[in-house]
Amino acid sequence: MERMKKILIAGAMTLLMLCPAKAQIAWQQVEPGVWKGVVGTPEEYSLLGVAGVTPQKEGFARLPEVALPELANEIVGSIQDGKTSLRIPLQRKEQLYGFGLNFQAVHQRGKILNLHVDHYGGRDNGRTHAPVPFYISSSGYGVLINSARYLTVYAGSGARKDSPNVPVAKDR
């Protein structure tokens, strides 16, 4: 009986280690129309911290107050093996632009991008020598990931079965 209990506990712990822990996203309004979401514990060293600049708040003061966008309620954060991930749902025809200097593509949806400094080498392989963890969506919002770490971005490169915008399945 005692051995069976130990096996069950070990099995449950293994399942917990394999399943990513959902992380609560703490939303805070920074300026009118600008929201900051924090997942987990931010590191001391960050892009905005190193830049040491403050935004020109006069322009923001002219913007109207807006509530937290509905999209924020659909964003899911998780932390597993010391890695933080965000899942931001996209609309069916939504396009993404940005992530730094890219020589061969403007539209980034459907790509896997490795955001760390690298030699371009004449290939559009997701690497760049000028990475920027910021993108703008054709739906009218922008996302900045305030991290100085290497990032891998799956920019709409997959589809979830539970998505309300699941694409039509194709036999390939």
Where on the chain are the PLM-derived regions?
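Sec/Tat signal peptide C-region and signal peptidase I cleavage site
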Residues: 19-23
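Positively charged n-region of N-terminal signal peptides that target proteins for export
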Residues: 1-7
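Bacterial N-terminal signal peptides
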Residues: 10-17
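Catalytic and substrate-binding clefts that recognize carbohydrates or anionic sugar/phosphate headgroups
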Residues: 24-172
